[in-house]
UniProtKB/Swiss-Prot annotation:
Record keywords: Cell adhesion impairing toxin, Disulfide bond, Hemostasis impairing toxin, Platelet aggregation inhibiting toxin, Secreted, Toxin
InterPro entries, alphabetized: Disintegrin_CS, Disintegrin_dom, Disintegrin_dom_sf
SUPFAM superfamilies with a match to the protein in the record: Blood coagulation inhibitor (disintegrin) (SSF57552)
Gene3D superfamilies found in the cross-reference section: Disintegrin domain
Record domain Disintegrin: where: 1-47
Comment field (misc): The disintegrin belongs to the short disintegrin subfamily.
Disulfide-bond pairs as recorded: C2-C11, C7-C32, C8-C37, C20-C39
A GO CC annotation given for this chain: extracellular region
Protein family: Belongs to the venom metalloproteinase (M12B) family. P-II subfamily. P-IIa sub-subfamily.
A molecular-function term among this protein's GO annotations: toxin activity
UniProt keyword annotation of Disulfide bond present: yes
Expressing tissues: Expressed by the venom gland.
Protein name: Disintegrin pyramidin-B
Length: 49
């Protein structure tokens, strides 16, 4: 399925919902979608305090 990338392991796409980028600051975690080797950016942010 894939050769390399944050959502690729052993030439297979990682399962949908696998965290591929941990949250930093007000960002939320990014998750693999099970269809691409890239790590899709989560557009959502944590609400301001």
């Amino acid at each position: 399925d894939c050769a390399s990338g944050p959502c690729c392991r052993d030439c297979k796409f990682l399962e949908e919902g696998t965290i591929c980028n941990m949250a930093r600051g007000d960002d939320m975690d990014d998750y693999c979608n099970g269809k691409t080797c890239d790590c899709p950016r989560n557009p959502h942010k944590w609400p301001a305090p």
